Amino acid sequence: MTKFPLLEICVETLDAAMAAERGGADRIELCENLQVGGVTPSTDLMRAVRSQVHIPVFAMIRPRAGDFFYSEKEFKQMARDLAIAKGLGMDGVVLGLLGTDHRVDVRRTRTLADLARPLPVTFHRAFDETPNLREALEDVIATGAARILTSGGGPSAEQGVGALAELVDAGRKRIRIMPGAGISAANIERILQTTRAREVHSGLSTVVPSPRADYRKFETEVGKLAELLKKPPAERS
């Protein structure tokens, strides 16, 4: 277990991945098209990031935008994409499948988790669309996933902080709960103090429209989060 909470940053380009690493991120979630919540990155992007970035990289496995109810063809595509990500040296994968009842698709998620081994699986924020978070927690644990990325069912982690704290406690020693959605230097202290989470996820994608000045701003924002996480709780501000 890491001494300090781990910071995962979601990115969609090589430049952003490199800036996140320079800024102090501990891990990267690699996607494309973050405007729709992220989809599976291209083979070329995975290869480029793997060759240039030295911290762990987890690849999103999501064949399209929209809901998380996947056809059999889409499911097979996810399995193929997962195998490609594994072959390209990704350190983990991020995915989530629901049934038409909005509950976790345990069977097919477990199949993908088995295909991913020994890579860890993060079940993404499809979790927040389930009707009962505690039931969904047990379902995800049953799939063999290593962690859940969640806002606690709210629009943001700050708004879902109470549910997040309950999930962290309920999942302790069985699965990692990683708060995500709207996490910033302004609210990370309260989220960590309330939830006692050991990992946090932030996108910061709104500050990266330019490959020059705004990427320096992106790196600075990541650095602020990383600096806060490396301080003892009493010294965070």
Describe the predicted segments one by one.
Residues K86-T143:
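Hydrophobic, well-structured mid-protein blocks that either form specific transmembrane helices
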Residues R27-V39, I84-T100, A145-E158, T195-E219:
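Glycine-rich phosphate-binding active-site loops on the catalytic face of alpha/beta enzymes
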Residues M1-C10, L14, R50-S51, P233-R236:
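N-terminal amphipathic alpha-helix/helix-capping segment at the start of soluble metabolic enzymes
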